[in-house]
Amino acid sequence: MKKIIIVGGGLAGSLTAIYLARRGHDVHVFEKRGDPFLVHSDYIDKVSLRAIGVSMTIRGIKAVLNAGIPKEELDLCGLPISGMSFYVGGKFRTRDLSPLESLSPLSLSRSDFQQLLNKYAVKNKVHYHYGQRCLDVDLDNKSLIVKNNEGEITEHKADLLIGADGVHSCVRQAMQHDCRRFEYQQFFFKHGYKTLVIADASEVMLRKDLIYFFGMDSGGLFAGRAATIPDGSTSFAVCLPYQGDISLQTRNALTMKKFFDQYYSMLPETTRAQLLSQFLDKPSNDLINVRSSCYHYKQHALILGDAAHATAPFLGQGMNMALEDAYLLDTLFDKFKNDIGQLLPEFTRIRKAEADAMQDMAIANYDVLSSSNPVFFMRAKYTRYMSKKFPANYPPDMAEKLYFTSMAYSELRDIQKKQNVWYKLGRVN
């Protein structure tokens, strides 16, 4: 049995902890936020401000179920997703997706899902240390220094350190300093976002089984998303630039009222008023893309989830890939018979290529959703028609594969590229 310290007790960190604890390891999770089971903890408050309604696709579901979490309990955290709808020119264009497996994607309550993971982590004897902010990581000594809410500073050592501490990862920063030829790339998207919540979804009059997208008729001004979760609330993510007459910095109520009246005209006036009030009151959040050339350091440390490969949420795969990271790590323990020296480099080799592919697709999707693209729907319709008419020759529907399978991201990116070629040929013909 090894002592393993995981920095970060979010979704990726908690699922990883479950997998490792099931193998008999002594797992300790250090989390800067409070206990998610405490209603008034800072964890819940911060998540409610930043979470863009989380969509769990089949790859994420399989990663959770393989950790021994019952499907019926996971289902209680979300609502089944059967398709997506785009609001353009005052009308909805709805696309139902055809299930390819017995499982269905879920629109999750992030806080409920976090509590579910913590529940099973504790059942598997994972030790959580809340209110512990990581100050420094010593990779060669496999130790970290943390500071609790009372200001007490302590040092903790382990046999393996895992960084699941998000986009501003302490563990990754230590790797940047200590890893020879470590390459790190970061850029901010021109848009940030605010999360607005309507407590009673019945007011909104949107289908609970659809994910909604807004802004494709805005000429690149903004991109929006909406989804309903089991508690009956609907979460709206409004992504806008940081500068301009209409932006995340706009404080003119009349200007933003016109914005919501134009692009959310299908909502009741009282609902639009609630969105406006929240928009003017809530802080904005950044969208950032992170690429790391290596995910491990010697036999001492590993990074996964957003710490390794954060990106914009416009493909809906950030959380799903993070959960799949935990599952892959578990399979590598079997493949290499617990040999850390072999499995950590293999994790980097496999996951780096897949993360790059996922990020490439997310960035491409962001460009489509945040820019004026009048041929988007024509192209989507053409793709579905061709894949059904000529299944042996034309690439399959990428959206259905993305939501309903665990197909490798690198394969999905190849499908996307082939569809681009076929579409160009179709236009020429």
Question: Where are the regions that the model predicts?
Answer:
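Conserved Rossmann-like nucleotide-cofactor binding loop
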Residues: 12, 16, 35, 168
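Conserved N-terminal helical subregion
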Residues: 21, 57-197
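Extreme N-terminal leader/targeting segments of oxidoreductases
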Residues: 1-4, 22-23
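Conserved mid-domain beta->alpha element of the FAD-binding
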Residues: 9-18, 22, 163, 196, ...
